[in-house]
């Protein structure tokens, strides 16, 4: 018995380690509100070509489900709002739906989530309290009957409008008018270990209030921080602030264990006249590139540092039949002919830079560098240097003893190298070289000897000290290697433990 306990304990520890090292996942939303899209089979080929492994669809279309068969792509399917009434009224209806519309394609098609309703609290035609939770329960019951309730998770997606307050994040609170719906929904999620699914769009905050919200702040490009006065936590982007507001709102209702999954986020490439300043290809490329890198490197949020999060980018294609402003039809990553609207690396491993050339704060180029200002005080330089090497996520290895940029061993020299690394990593924008006035842009390359000052457009492979560029990109690959090693250890442990148990039994 003691040996059996040790075996179980060892396996549990290994599984825990495996779970801890898994990184955040980036998926894409495959909406089909268009009359010019390629066939589902061609769409699947496109998705595979771009190494996309997680996809959300908004219904359970048979052609789409069949197309994803034998691909290993994890699929999130949806019960549309129009089906909620029927799903909430009859368990037999849901059992029949599962039998006829889902099970014929499972497990060949790797379905992992079912969303019951989409932003139903924003739909004037849906009574969320009457339909959503009962429909979720009926879907779960149907899954339990066929033994799939642990393999396919059930949830519903909501918008940020579910909050009555989102700033400061620590004051995040749910809208009391939804209390009758939220409590049973959250109890369902907690009991079944399902994620809280939210659609987040910092784009709208900037579009609707450009004079009060910084573009760099919503694009993950801000060199300054917004402080939460209640917690002292510092926020460099709006996405993290919105996610933490949700975590605090959940905590206020004593639902601390529920994980958050972002089922939609993105940025449009075109818009109506009122959206022209915000909606652009440059801004879309910058936002989506940065959110992907943010997720796969497990940065987490200030309130949940290092915590993995799954995020789905909206949307795969421009959808020409969507109603509303021009931007509604221009969120796509690809045109209907399957060419890219802009370049995007879904793995987050690319070392490339995506210059936000259309932004009002962007004037950087491959011929610009950022160095320490000769007018800056020692105190300001020291503070900016410490910040860049810490919260600023710059790899400062090159200025350590025996490294290429350690000499001359002066504060100005070290700060100059670090300032430039941060500047280039953050799209070489003017604000990325401010450092509270301690930084200044120059057009002459400050590189010397083997100390290479990188540029956004330069050849980074020749820079012997350009580790800051690759540190974030190497994290996912390092996690993959660690996962493989731990899995190998688990298999070896199981093999020898079973051998020992068999020999003792004999």
Swiss-Prot record:
A GO MF term: glucan endo-1,3-beta-D-glucosidase activity
Compartment(s): Secreted, Cell wall; Cell membrane
Domain of life of the source: Eukaryota
One term under GO cellular component: side of membrane
Modification after translation (UniProt): Contains two additional disulfide bonds.
Disulfide bond positions: 370-433
Family annotation (Gene3D superfamilies): 1.20.58.1040, Glycosidases (3.20.20.80)
Pfam family, one: Glyco_hydro_17
Keyword Glycoprotein: yes
Coiled coil segments of this chain: none
Membrane topology field: Lipid-anchor; GPI-anchor
Enzyme Commission identifier(s): 3.2.1.39
Signal peptide feature range: 1-22
GO biological process, one term: carbohydrate metabolic process
Catalytic activity: Hydrolysis of (1->3)-beta-D-glucosidic linkages in (1->3)-beta-D-glucans
Positions of the propeptide segment: 472-506
Keywords: Cell membrane, Cell wall, Cell wall biogenesis/degradation, Disulfide bond, Glycoprotein, Glycosidase, GPI-anchor, Hydrolase, Lipoprotein, Membrane, Plant defense, Secreted, Signal
Top EC group: hydrolase
Covalent lipid sites (GPI-anchor amidated serine): 471
Record-stated family: Belongs to the glycosyl hydrolase 17 family.
PANTHER family in the cross-refs: GLUCAN ENDO-1,3-BETA-GLUCOSIDASE BG1-RELATED-RELATED (PTHR32227)
Protein name: Glucan endo-1,3-beta-glucosidase 13
Organism: Arabidopsis thaliana
